[in-house]
């Protein structure tokens, strides 16, 4: 029987792994790394998604599914991550969307993460170019990623359903960053498959009455025999929407880059999502890419030689040269199948 060995959520000092068994807590000071394992890349045929999250709101509680009358509205909140409010006080209401007739039971936290149908979501904040940034004060966007995660868990059973719902919500209501002014990635899994969706905002001048999408987003499926990591950085590269089993995206996924001069369709060069919308790569992202891929697939290519052989050499062993981030793939086939314990071990790693 296919099953999801689902979400490893590390919330500042606590972690919860929900499956048929409970895994002991994992502790982390701070991080926001997602690791995804396809069903043919795991030791027991499970799909694994994980999330280390340093959000303020680490309390976890169950929100039961409910039935609603026709025409009901669902509030859109700002403040879901506020740990100072009562447990079921989700903050200020920014607006409303149509409610569904029935919602599913889910685990609620600062980044809510799994529902009764084993749909699981991990989150990792990315970085976006300054021209795309917006905020609550200056923009009209109202949909934060943590709110969209809740709507997906309440309304969806499958990963690709969740991708479509979240993308649609972001387009219609506008993506409002809540972790600084930055973009977001979600690793969404069900018992059969896993997807990565990346969401970028469209600046402060967006108007919901304009008819234009209130976000730029793209999603790619992780191959069943592959693993992937999202270390607070975009990982989606070239997108082929003719391959509907593998890619999804908003209608404006190229146009915004064209409008800003970040890509010229007449140049003859392919459109690379990661390059178009991400700023200059940072070492804290490339180091995690390197550690993960050189560990799970050491012979995939000649990875940069960043291994520290002398712990006493150098003032700061982690700040080394910055390699071209394009050398790291979207995903890779691991040389050894991974278990939940392997994922936990990597999430605990401190580059020793």
What role is predicted for each listed range?
Residues 1-21:
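Bacterial Sec-dependent N-terminal signal peptides
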Residues 4, 13-14, 286, 293, ...:
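Intrinsically disordered, low-complexity segments enriched in Ser/Pro/Gly/Ala and basic residues
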Residues 11, 166-170, 350:
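Alpha-helix boundary/capping residues
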Residues 21-145, 165-318, 333-335:
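A contiguous strand-loop segment
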Residues 149-155:
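Short, well-ordered beta-strand elements within core beta-sheets of diverse protein domains
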Residues 316-352:
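Long, well-ordered mid-to-C-terminal structural blocks that present hydrophobic/aromatic surfaces
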